[in-house]
Amino acid sequence: MKLVDQPKFSNGNILAVSLDNYYSLGSCKTVVQYIKGPNAATPFGNGSWIDYWSLVKGNNSNDAHRWQFLNYGDMKIGDFGFAHSLYYTVASGFEGWETSKESDKAFSFVVRPYYKLTDISKITAELGFFTETTKYQNGESENYQGQKATLAYVLSPDAGNWKSRPELRFYVTYLHSNDTQALVESPSQDKKVVMNDGTTYAPRDNQVIFGAQLEAWW
């Protein structure tokens, strides 16, 4: 593969402002960020393939910019608890596939209520939603959406503290997506989706998962 002259990248700049609120029932944190330059495309993990196209096509995203808004927090009332996470972002002017200038916006929201059963156990639920829309220079656009619902039995040293770790979760999760290739079932020849390794799967827009998860912080 022949590479063109490497593009000249400008320095990336990030300006962030955060506000922390602490009150008797819990806490809440709000963050607003403005990102200018090539790193404006990285929040969705786009950095690797943007670097690739920059080397191959000689592009850069020096004029790209992004706004991000984050809000998350927790609240506790007796044996009941509640946590949430909200994220919104909008960006434009970054290089995508080939030489197109792209813009995107995305929103996600997750809530996680729980009920403490004993000092070391609790029942928790999790509801989540996301949507992302990307617009291309040629006028075309793509939209992806997904939802999830989880119910879990959780063991931890202090079940009333959402930060308590290590944590063992036994869970069942329902997933739904409008991108049928995001969720796949057992191999099938009826509706072909060929993966990179040549495996053929049948696409689907929903999935149920049972599992166990061990999480530790240090």
Region spans (language model):
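Detector for outer-membrane/organellar transmembrane beta-barrel domains
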Residues: K2-Q137, N143-L151, L155
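C-terminal structured domain segments
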Residues: E140-G198
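Short, P/G- and charge-enriched loop/turn segments at secondary-structure junctions
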Residues: F82, T199-T200
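Tryptophan-centered motif/residue detector
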Residues: L117, S177, W217-W218
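Outer-membrane beta-barrel "beta-signal"
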Residues: L151, L155-P157, Y201-W218
